[in-house]
Curated annotation (Swiss-Prot):
The chain crosses the membrane at residues 28-48, 63-83, 93-113, 122-142. This is High osmolarity signaling protein sho1. Residues 49-62, 114-121 are extracellular. GO terms for cellular component: plasma membrane. It is a multi-pass membrane protein. One of its GO terms (biological process) is regulation of actin filament polymerization. Keywords: Cell membrane, Glycoprotein, Membrane, SH3 domain, Stress response, Transmembrane, Transmembrane helix. It is found in: Cell membrane. The gene is sho1.
Length: 317
């Protein structure tokens, strides 16, 4: 329920946050939309001149007018989607509409390109440009953000998160086998069956453990499952009265006191109320991280709160 409500909130916020900065700050979007509008005007003016120079029903295909109207709607729709930063919400629909538009523009080119009339040739040239832009858009919107060509184009955009291609990389940011993929929706924090969960000892999480049993958190052996979607940690080192035991072994790892890494939240996250180890954070919030080797990172917020956070909600800076 939290994931669904957060997704709806992000989508609504994206529509309310429509801004020209998303267009002007993205060279690819600015260039392709500008070329598409120029091509549309060429086709539109050429169609007017071609229709005026021929008697009604003679020479100029009527469906070319529908093509012009249809492509205008596609261009305006893409403009709105990019300006509202909801590309990953509507990218499938965009590809479908562009595929239909490519068929229409190609048919118009085939009907007009062989004419000796200059107005028809100009109209055909406009439709050719529209077809080329449609092909580029279909490749862009039909690719995942982790695709190398799209990631390269997105790297020039000012408003988009730039993800590194090595180390943790984009596969972690977009699920790494256990997320829902990509987009404005939050990824899932559940664990897939083909990757073992990350285990921690009580010494590693000494500062995160509670002084009393938490409801829904059975004290079984390490790896025991619980009803939550979060991974099960190692057995606690609690004493009989609920306090942390004083015994320590040479092999134990002390609680980290340094946080050498910085990470940015690419999604907001609400901590599980049944697990006091987790911390909540907002989208774009900066966290300090002590260890980036597992799925759950030990993090500290700017206000000093410490806890664990899912790695697929964060991106290293």
């Amino acid at each position: 329920m939290n994931g669904q409500s957060d997704y709806k909130g992000q989508r609504t916020a994206g529509m309310r946050g429509m801004s020209m900065d998303n267009i002007l700050g993205d060279p690819f979007a600015l260039a392709t939309i500008s070329i598409a509008m120029l091509a549309w005007f060429i086709a539109f003016i050429g169609s007017i001149l071609a229709t005026a120079s021929h008697p009604p029903g003679d020479g100029f295909p009527n469906y070319s007018w529908f093509t012009i109207a249809y492509m205008l709607c596609c261009i305006l729709g893409i403009f709105v989607v990019i300006a509202s930063d909801t590309t990953q919400t509507y990218h499938v629909a965009i590809v479908g509409f562009l595929a239909t538009g490519l068929v229409l523009t190609s048919s118009s080119v085939n009907s007009l390109i062989y004419s000796s009339n200059g107005a028809k040739e100009a109209t055909a040239a406009g439709h050719i440009l529209l077809s080329m832009v449609a092909i580029v858009w279909m490749f862009y919107f039909g690719s995942t953000p982790s695709a190398v060509p799209r990631a390269y184009l997105d790297s020039f955009a000012l408003h988009k998160d730039h993800r590194v291609s090595s180390g943790r990389g984009m596969s972690t940011a977009y699920g790494n086998g256990y997320g829902h993929g990509y987009g404005n929706g939050r990824p899932d924090t559940s664990i897939s069956s083909n990757v073992p969960p990350q285990m921690y000892t009580s010494a590693q999480l000494g500062g995160f453990e509670t002084s009393s049993p938490v409801a829904g958190f059975p004290g079984g052996a390490a790896g025991a499952e619980r009803n939550s979607s979060q991974p099960r940690f190692g057995a606690s080192n609690l004493g009989p009265n609920g306090a942390m035991g004083s015994e320590s072994t040479p092999g134990e790892v002390v609680q980290p006191t340094e946080y050498p890494y910085r990470a940015k939240a690419i999604y907001s996250y609400d901590a599980n109320p049944d697990d006091a180890n987790e911390i909540s954070f907002a989208k774009h919030e900066i966290l300090e991280v002590s260890d980036v080797s597992g799925r759950w990172w030990q993090a500290k917020k700017e206000n000093g709160d410490t806890g664990i956070a899912p790695s697929n909600y964060l991106i290293l800076l």
